[in-house]
């Protein structure tokens, strides 16, 4: 089970610098609010570090082509808007003059304009969603690749940080985080071009407004433009002020939703244990608490939406009326035609909408902010694991090659937690080909942690773990993983099901006592729920015999089996894989009979230490003696059964 080096991670992620010190270790000089704001600001920066690679990666030319095409379509669409605005003036002037010929002529012109505008809108949606789809696919591939590299998905469970529910962040938050920016950028470009175009229209049509107040006369040049700017400034400022807590509330809501889903998932995944223990009431209490948090956050979000709706809804009602009221004096004194009034009203609405883009998009902007930060938090936690594997900060366990006849060696190996707390201290072990080594010790002495360090899943510590370069490692955990799909796929995992024939997999199932499932190898079912704990462990041994590795690591791999079944599995390991090297972690004393050495870990103040390395069977002739012992044990057991 070799682990790819960190250098193989995507180039776009290699250059990520550590976050500022105040993010990793809060500065006493900063208030909690300032520290939190610094963290939020960095998270957005971290998101863009990952996200911008889409335009420079393989396929970046296509991304740029879609982006440039989208901008071109937006510009063309604004041009059509201007043409329709001019048509609006002409049609109302013709109606005012009761010019039927012009009305019919302009009606004929309208249909090509409408068809062109609709076509542009359709192509604009295609380009916009094309960018969103491709960006999401690219960033998802990048995040999932890093999440699945070097066991990061597992290591995240071992370290502190804001990375809970990574599956929800990848599936949902990442979708929002890539969809919204494309909408925002296209919206801003459209708003800017629309504002620039129709401000000219307002300035040209409206001209200056002369006001008399207190005997004094005032002239306001471009009064319609001034009114549009003032109105947009008031509504935007009101929206920013009223919605200033929207981002935090939206982020808390998303987190509460994720925790609620996780609580429900836990019940489904552990249904048997909960049912056997009668823990329904306790689980209901936990679910109710997480759901109460969801309702509380939804209530807060509802309040935010209600406040921002006051501004957005009020603006949408008032905006069309203002230009009519402002143009009414000029229309009534005959200095402005009906067509000019309608053109000005349309232009004012477009300008106000452009200036009020923030008003209309503030809630979604807040939601994007929260989702982007959740993705960035996940990436930042993975960054920390990468730094740990490179040896930045606390020590890193080195991985190398053995010398001489050794298949596996631990050289001055110390294993620590991610904060530097010692778990295992200064382990020195050399294991030769064909040895069966049992790692024993009290619960909590770090046996499983030591095994994870050997397998490469635990990077924190010092010293080195060395393997023979030509030997393959295979690990059997206490809870074997059963993937979705057919039983054939589950038996072959992590290799492809097609790597072995149905007959070969059937033989392996026969060996481990699962022959009754041979006829169901191609059946797709929820096998993780169908198989018992013991059957899953038998299936794991079937995988082992199919893969035929050189080094086997067993981490409580027979804990769900009865003594007879356990003996059978261990006898099969010795029979089917006589030359393999085995390292086992177990509590059952009976397993000593299947091993040639026992390493004992003992808890000490500075971390567990290897206090004894015992030969269970003399090394000279150990395989012959072990084989004889196992035959005698089996014969005696059969006699007792008779």
Can you say where each PLM-predicted feature lies in the sequence?
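Cytosolic ends of transmembrane helices, especially the final helix of ABC transmembrane type-1 domains
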Residues: 131, 243-247, 258, 273-279, ...
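An intracellular "coupling" helix at the cytosolic face of ABC transporter transmembrane type-1 domains
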Residues: 172-178, 248-269, 275-322, 364-367, ...
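Conserved "ABC signature" C-loop
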Residues: 480-526
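Short intracellular "coupling" helices and adjacent cytoplasmic loop segments at the cytosolic face
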Residues: 30-36, 98-100, 130-133, 143-170, ...
């Amino acid at each position: 089970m070799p682990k790819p080096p960190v250098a193989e991670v995507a180039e776009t992620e290699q250059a990520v610098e550590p976050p500022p010190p105040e993010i990793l270790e809060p500065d006493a000089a900063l208030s909690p609010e300032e520290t939190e704001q610094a963290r939020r600001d960095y998270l957005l920066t971290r998101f863009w570090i990952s996200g911008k690679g889409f335009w420079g990666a393989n396929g970046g030319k296509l991304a740029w082509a879609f982006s440039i095409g989208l901008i071109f379509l937006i510009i063309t669409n604004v041009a059509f808007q201007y043409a329709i605005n001019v048509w609006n003036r002409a049609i109302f002037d013709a109606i005012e003059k009761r010019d039927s010929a012009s009305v019919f002529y302009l009606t004929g012109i309208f249909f090509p304009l409408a068809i062109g505008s609709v076509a542009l809108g359709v192509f604009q949606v295609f380009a916009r969603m094309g960018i969103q789809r491709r960006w999401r696919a690219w960033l998802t591939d990048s995040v999932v690749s890093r999440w699945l590299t070097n066991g990061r998905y597992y290591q995240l469970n071992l370290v502190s940080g804001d990375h809970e529910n990574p599956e929800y962040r990848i599936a949902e938050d990442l979708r929002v985080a890539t969809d919204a920016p494309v909408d925002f950028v296209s919206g801003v470009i459209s708003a800017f071009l629309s504002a620039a175009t129709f401000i000219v229209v307002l300035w040209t049509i409206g001209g200056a407004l002369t006001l008399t107040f207190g005997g004094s006369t005032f002239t306001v040049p471009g009064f319609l433009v001034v009114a549009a700017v003032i109105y947009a400034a008031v509504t935007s400022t009101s929206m920013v002020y009223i919605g200033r807590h929207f981002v935090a509330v939206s982020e808390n809501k998303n987190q509460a939703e994720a925790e609620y889903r996780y609580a429900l998932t836990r019940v489904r995944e552990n249904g048997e244990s909960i049912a056997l223990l009668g823990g329904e009431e306790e689980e209901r209490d936990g679910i109710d608490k997480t759901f109460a948090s969801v309702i509380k956050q939804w209530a807060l979000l509802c309040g935010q939406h209600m406040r921002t709706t006051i501004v957005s809804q009020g603006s949408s009602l008032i905006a069309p009326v203002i230009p009519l009221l402002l143009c009414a004096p000029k229309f009534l004194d005959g200095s402005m035609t009906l067509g000019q009034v309608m053109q000005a009203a349309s232009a004012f609405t477009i300008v106000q909408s452009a200036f009020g883009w923030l008003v209309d998009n503030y809630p979604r902007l807040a939601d994007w902010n929260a989702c982007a930060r959740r993705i960035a938090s996940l990436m930042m936690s993975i960054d920390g694991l990468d730094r740990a594997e490179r040896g930045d900060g606390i020590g890193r366990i080195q991985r190398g090659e053995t010398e001489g006849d050794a298949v596996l060696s631990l050289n001055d190996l110390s294993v620590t937690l991610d904060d530097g707390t010692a778990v295992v201290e200064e382990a020195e072990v050399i294991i030769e080909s064909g040895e069966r080594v049992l790692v024993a010790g009290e619960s909590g002495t770090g046996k499983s942690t030591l095994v994870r360090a050997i397998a490469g899943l635990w990077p924190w510590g010092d010293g080195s773990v060395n393997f023979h370069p030509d030997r393959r490692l295979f690990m059997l955990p206490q809870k074997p993983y059963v993937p979705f799909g057919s039983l054939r796929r589950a038996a072959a995992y992590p290799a492809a099901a097609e790597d072995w024939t149905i007959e070969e997999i059937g033989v392996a199932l026969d060996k481990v006592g699962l022959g009754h499932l041979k006829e169901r190898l191609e059946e797709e079912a929820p096998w993780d729920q169908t198989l018992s704990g013991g059957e899953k462990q038998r299936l794991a041994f079937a995988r082992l015999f199919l893969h035929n590795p050189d080094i086997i690591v067993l981490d409580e791999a027979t804990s769900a089996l009865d003594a007879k079944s356990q003996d059978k599995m261990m006898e099969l390991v010795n029979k089917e894989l006589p030359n393999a090297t085995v390292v086992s972690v177990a509590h059952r004393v009976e397993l000593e009979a299947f091993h040639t050495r026992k390493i004992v870990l003992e808890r000490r103040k500075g971390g567990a230490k290897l206090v004894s390395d015992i030969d269970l069977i003399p090394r000279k002739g150990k395989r012959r003696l072990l084989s004889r012992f196992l035959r005698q044990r089996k014969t005696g057991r059969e006699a007792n059964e008779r």
